[in-house]
Amino acid sequence: MDYEVCRKVWESHVPCQFTLQSSGGTHGEPLPFYTMLPRFSYLALAIQKVLSSFNRRDDGEKVHSDKMWLEHNGIPLKMYIPIGVIYDQANLSENDSILEIIVRTSQPPPQFQMVDRDMMEAMFMQNIKEADYLKTKAEITKNMMKDESAQLWRSVCNIPDNFDEFWTIVQKLMETSEGNEFAHIPLRVYVKNQAFKQALITAKHPDGSLRTIGEAVSDVLSSSSSSSTDSQSEHPPRLISHGIDIPHHTPLIFAAKNLSYPDNFIHVVLLLVVP
């Protein structure tokens, strides 16, 4: 693991605008709420601060978290996917770089799932365990102390905003040694308007050569018959993670150790290249 690379990834934030659209109120909607959110965080952790701002309006009407839903460009958002992934999926231009999120108080669509803070913590810790099972058959998480798990979650909640505390714990989850390498790499691939995809992917080919992230993504897509992405296109898709165009030849093990989100998965967004 590279300390400086991981720290830069950790410090990355994205600009977000939350706009309330409700059916009630006599004084109109409150002004949009603007904020910078960590890429590694989740909408489930941000929404209470957003609603607190909206609930200060003069007419006294309150918006409750269990009676609202979120959308971007008409698509319901997933509160349990890292904010950085949502931002990268939006594929915003440099001139329109703010992620605009609509907070609606109408009946939520079936595909929207409300996730509160406690649910998000449980989902995050489950992802950590799944990632460790893929890598080490859960050897690390089985031996983690309870306060270490709690410290990892506090770091995601930015309590406190201390990268070094996170670094201490995540190093244990990323340790490898000669003859004790990761069995598989936790990788999730996102294609527009589809659920994320993952498969059992090794860091090396059978001949011992390093698998690249481009090869790994192709393997994940080929294992999914539902994908509409043409991996044989004349123009290879862009691989985006943390807002970075990841070169296809990047070793997968490097990405796993330096570009994974705090849940220990590499989250890669595929963007098709239009000639």
Curated annotation (Swiss-Prot):
The keyword rRNA-binding does not apply. Residues 221-241 are annotated as: Disordered. Keywords: Autophagy, Isopeptide bond, Membrane, Ubl conjugation. Conjugated to lgg-3/ATG12; which is essential for autophagy. One of its GO terms (biological process) is mitophagy. It comes from the Eukaryota. It is a peripheral membrane protein. The keyword Ubl conjugation applies. Pfam families: ATG5_HBR, ATG5_UblA, ATG5_UblB. Its main location: membrane. It is found in: Preautophagosomal structure membrane. One of its GO terms (cellular component) is Atg12-Atg5-Atg16 complex. Residues 221-231 have a biased composition (Low complexity). InterPro entries: Atg5, ATG5_HBR, Atg5_HR, ATG5_UblA, Atg5_UblA_dom_sf, ATG5_UblB. There is a cross-link at K129 (Glycyl lysine isopeptide (Lys-Gly) (interchain with G-Cter in lgg-3/ATG12)). Involved in autophagic vesicle formation. Conjugation with lgg-3/ATG12, through a ubiquitin-like conjugating system involving atg-7 as an E1-like activating enzyme and atg-10 as an E2-like conjugating enzyme, is essential for its function. Most likely a component of an atg-5-lgg-3-atg-16 complex that promotes autophagosome formation by associating with lgg-2, but not lgg-1, at the preautophagosomal membrane. Probably, as part of an atg-5-lgg-3-atg-16 complex, required for lgg-1 lipidation; the complex acts as an E3-like enzyme promoting atg-3-mediated lgg-1 lipidation. Most likely a component of a complex at least containing atg-5, lgg-3/ATG12, atg-16.1 and/or atg-16.2. Interacts with lgg-3/ATG12. Interacts with atg-16.1 (via N-terminus) and atg-16.2 (via N-terminus). Belongs to the ATG5 family. This is Autophagy-related protein 5. It comes from Caenorhabditis elegans.
